[in-house]
Swiss-Prot record:
Gene (UniProt): TDC1
Keyword Metal-binding among record annotations: no
Enzyme Commission (EC) number: 4.1.1.28
Protein name: Tryptophan decarboxylase 1
Effect of residue 300 to G: Reduces enzymatic activity 7-fold
Source species of the chain: Oryza sativa subsp. japonica (Rice)
Length: 514
């Protein structure tokens, strides 16, 4: 086993300063280190387009290149930065690359980076209002701004024109957390409603989602203690463009109720990961209301598009759901991690998650006039996430953010038209936002004579494309068929990147088919 080398000669190149006091926040060092870090970031964004999107490294490569044990003695920061450049960057998958089309984007911006940097420097831990009033109030303000941009009902806002509302929001790390905390709240409400003593009735609770729902939902259900046998995955098909069919949902919920189970929670998705399908929010809410089940809307990706009036209809009926989450870190120029969860009645959430140890008690919390965000999440500690979201909205404004969304959608439309213009390919599902699902169609050539052959041809096309380093695309399975996903939205992408990727796809396909 490896061990810490305490021999000073092993690190003779990095001598420790004799008699120097350790000052990790020395003002001169902070300025020097951050200047170098900012220069690195700026250079990275200038050069990332020329880097292979996918790295050519093997598992364990980094331990072979860097020290297996931590150094005993100090090293100049320049040495640390040199190792970052020489060893870490070559092993990165470059999500910031304009040639990255594989997954939903992790967008970023100068304002978000600055906000995240400042929040990290302040390093506040705003678990209660008193622990950092500005951190809590900034988060509340940013969430209410975003709620207005999304035209959410005031019932989801922390503050209304009449003062503090009954609803509100919290910024979490991921959609997984948003689903987990709302599942816990729904679970507890259903247990109370069914007259169960504690968790004794947990085995009777049932939850529902379409088979296109993100896997994180099914994971969160297990974490919340739901019996896997009662987690319903409702089949979808081409007849509903792979969105959840309210009639099938009603059938499943009614069958469970008739069997003595308690329908507890329904997850509707606006913009599924596989194909960008949209579940009909209003109709789903109407079905769930028959059983007093909690309805959550997962709009992690496509929720950002709903700041544009032309996409807002995808949230119609949201006033009848219990919670909704969306992730600005996907498509709203705000770096990871930033998932915004809104609930119509915060008391239902805090009732399940509240903790009040003696050492956290204070007059502000006891007054009921403030929000203690620790009571809307799993943990207690939390980052100052609201700052970067506020800085993005304050710096760019609604119009620029809408322009960003519309530009990505327009570029996706360009790609969709290019695909439709080549009879070797087909667009598999309607393009609702900025994701195009396409494939080499069966019958396009000898290498794709049957549907099964076409599946293999598409798999080979994806692998060949990704090996070039010039583009990165991913796949999914829709209707039993292997499909390529082309997701537009990287912050540095322009139309010429989309067209270049298409030329590479055409060229590679021609080489394969011949």
């Amino acid at each position: 086993m490896g061990s810490l080398d305490t021999n000073p000669t092993a690190f003779s190149a990095f001598p420790a300063g004799e008699g120097e006091t350790f000052q990790p926040l020395n003002a001169d060092d902070v300025r020097s280190y951050l200047h170098k870090a900012v220069d690195f970031i700026s250079d990275y964004y200038k050069s990332v387009e020329s880097m292979p999107v996918l790295p050519n490294v093997k598992p364990g490569y980094l331990q072979d290149e860097l020290r297996a044990s931590p150094p005993t003695y100090s090293a100049p920061f320049d040495v640390t930065m040199k190792e970052l450049r020489s060893s870490v960057v070559p092993g990165m998958t470059h999500w910031a690359s304009p040639n990255f089309f594989a997954f939903f984007p992790s967008t970023n911006s100068a304002a978000a980076i600055a906000g995240d940097l400042i929040a990290s420097a302040m390093n506040t831990v705003g678990f209660t209002w008193q622990a950092s009033p500005a951190a809590t109030e900034m988060e509340v303000l940013a969430l209410d701004w975003l709620a207005q941009m999304l035209n959410l009902p005031t019932s989801f806002m922390n503050r209304t024109g009449e003062g503090r509302g009954t609803g509100g929001g919290v910024i979490l790390g991921t959609t997984s957390e948003a689903m987990l905390v709302t599942l816990v709240a729904a679970r507890d409400a259903a247990l109370r409603r069914s007259g169960s003593d504690g968790v004794a009735g947990l085995h009777r609770l049932a939850v529902y989602a379409a088979d296109q729902t993100h896997s994180t939902f099914f994971k969160a259900c297990r974490l919340a203690g739901f019996d896997p046998a009662n987690i319903r995955s409702i089949p979808t098909g081409a007849e509903t463009d792979y969105g959840l069919d309210p009639a099938r949902l009603l059938e499943a919920m009614q069958a469970d109720a008739d069997a003595g189970l308690v329908p507890t929670y329904v997850c509707a998705t606006v913009g599924t990961t596989s194909s960008n399908a949209v579940d009909p929010v209003g109709a789903v809410a109407d079905v769930a209301a028959r059983f007093a089940a909690w309805v959550h809307v997962d709009a992690a990706y496509a929720g950002s598009a709903c700041i544009c009036p032309e996409f807002r209809h995808h949230l119609d009926g949201v006033e009848r759901v219990d919670s909704i989450s969306m992730s600005p870190h996907k498509w709203l120029m705000t770096c990871l991690d930033c998932t915004c969860l809104y609930v119509r009645d915060t008391h239902r959430l805090t009732g399940s998650l509240e903790t009040n140890p003696e050492y956290l008690k204070n007059h502000a919390s006891d007054s009921g006039e403030v929000t203690d965000l620790k009571d809307m999440q799993v943990g207690v500690g939390r980052r100052f996430r609201g700052l970067k979201l506020w800085m993005v909205m304050r710096t760019y404004g609604v119009a620029k953010l809408q322009e960003h969304i519309r530009s990505d959608v327009a570029m996706a439309k360009v790609f969709e038209d290019l695909v439709r213009g080549d009879d070797r390919f087909e667009v598999v599902v309607p393009r609702n936002f900025a994701l195009v699902c396409f494939r080499i169609r069966a019958g396009a050539g000898a290498a794709a004579a049957t549907e099964e052959d076409a599946d293999e041809a598409n798999r080979e096309l994806m692998e060949r494309l990704n090996k070039t380093g010039k583009a990165y695309v991913a796949h999914t399975v829709v209707g039993g068929r292997f499909v390529l996903r082309f997701a537009v939205g990287s912050s540095l992408q322009e139309e010429h990147h989309v067209r270049s990727a298409w030329e590479l796809i055409k060229k590679t396909t021609t080489e394969m088919m011949n």
